[in-house]
């Protein structure tokens, strides 16, 4: 179940609150609260600060995530985002488990409901000794949208 409330402030600012409740057989009950702040920089560019907290049944505490993205529409059917984020947990203490930077290229192709994304990223997770090592990843996503 999902609830979303969006509040624009003038032409350039927007605040969005999203609450998501899930029940899955393995993870059981999960609740995520998200708060986004957006500022339109130009007609085709905006900056977004996203914040999440998630509680999952059977875990001690919450996981959290905060990040900033710069999103730009390149053409009518393509866009790119530059992202940075960090996330962690609040138990036994508030800690940062991982840092991330990435770029996502998104393009609509062939049909209005078909998209692909290419996303390289670098993360710096904390290992058991507390050290951070670079981890590189590349994701390719195919998205099919149903409905309007």
Annotate each PLM feature.
Residues 1, 27-33, 60-66, 86, ...:
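Residues that define the transmembrane beta-barrel architecture of outer-membrane proteins
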Residues 3-7, 21, 33-39, 66-72, ...:
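Residues on the lipid-exposed face of transmembrane beta-strands in outer-membrane beta-barrel proteins
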Residues 4-10, 18-28, 52-60, 77, ...:
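Sequence/structural signature of outer-membrane beta-barrel proteins
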Residues 6-12, 38-44, 71-79, 110-112, ...:
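Outer-membrane beta-barrel channels and translocator barrels
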Residues 15-19, 33, 45-51, 66, ...:
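Membrane-embedded beta-strand positions of outer-membrane beta-barrel proteins
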Residues 20-64, 68-70:
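Aromatic-anchored, glycine/proline-accented short structural segments
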Residues 64-89, 94, 99-103, 107-109:
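Structured C-terminal portions of repeat-based eukaryotic scaffold domains
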Residues 109, 133-148:
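Outer-membrane beta-barrel "beta-signal"
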